[in-house]
């Protein structure tokens, strides 16, 4: 780690968004509050702490802020892989504002959010063209990405192992019509993976998300040109794999981009902040706005534009059913979020943190 002044050209090689000092007022304010601190990026996140770097070649274990160790501290306010922090020696002294992120409602009874990755330009939603192929799961990922500021790109792997690649692409035509890029690749073939180059330019950051066994680690190895990430075989009966990646990590690529690999996620719960129109359902939302009744359930109501589109073969009924399910989940999560915010506000007024606020998420 540098102990003198920021080396901005080197920081750019791990995703620093400016040619020199920060240009956003919110970042400038944090820098001003810590004049002796230097910027670094969180490149690994473990249950026991963080690893940060200010160059592509070197990283160090970092001592986190004391408040992050408190059991009730909101998990989404802790650093995540991709975050920029200010360091004094090996100690994190401040978390810089996030420019973009992808997050989910974390598993568990109590409401809390979990940041999957921060300050990312592109989210590669990876799904295998085998028994793992699931358009509904892809739609769920698109919902979580929508509104977070990053560009979603659907990557269908194992294009060399199936005769159904064209059928899968046909199923996803509705998403492509909404300008959501789709690419089918052989994750082991560098020439095939080259289709992802437009999103992996110098200084850009991308994150790979998808279920275990989808081919994320294989894709990472191909992009790196080396077998850095461990890969496991998938079960033939259901195409599911064991978790190859056990923690989130940011990896510099030869192209000059940074790639964040993530473990497979079983639960993809909304946070309540999602926008269905931005999350892959803009066409359904536009039709819903044309329904005769504002509270139309799109089942059998007269004047339902959504049902009319289904009957005309213009919308996939399974996709609409998933839209309805996700809409209910977002509404339910939004209610829980509103309740938590109200509890937080009451807690601030009394000088105490309420008992029901964020619990630590899984790192």
From Swiss-Prot:
SUPFAM superfamilies: P-loop containing nucleoside triphosphate hydrolases. GO terms for molecular function: GTP binding; GTPase activity; metal ion binding; rRNA binding. Keywords: Cytoplasm, GTP-binding, Hydrolase, Metal-binding, Nucleotide-binding, Ribosome biogenesis, RNA-binding, rRNA-binding, Zinc. One of its GO terms (cellular component) is cytoplasm. Zn(2+) binds at residues 291, 296, 298, 304. Residues 112-268 form the CP-type G domain. GO terms for biological process: ribosomal small subunit biogenesis. The keyword GTP-binding applies. Its cofactor is Zn(2+). Its main location: cytoplasm. GTP binds at residues 157-160, 210-218. Pfam families: RsgA_GTPase (PF03193). It is found in: Cytoplasm. The keyword RNA-binding applies. Belongs to the TRAFAC class YlqF/YawG GTPase family. RsgA subfamily. Monomer. Associates with 30S ribosomal subunit, binds 16S rRNA. One of several proteins that assist in the late maturation steps of the functional core of the 30S ribosomal subunit. Helps release RbfA from mature subunits. May play a role in the assembly of ribosomal proteins into the subunit. Circularly permuted GTPase that catalyzes slow GTP hydrolysis, GTPase activity is stimulated by the 30S ribosomal subunit. This is Small ribosomal subunit biogenesis GTPase RsgA. It comes from Xanthomonas axonopodis pv. citri (strain 306). The lineage of its organism: Bacteria, Pseudomonadati, Pseudomonadota, Gammaproteobacteria, Lysobacterales.
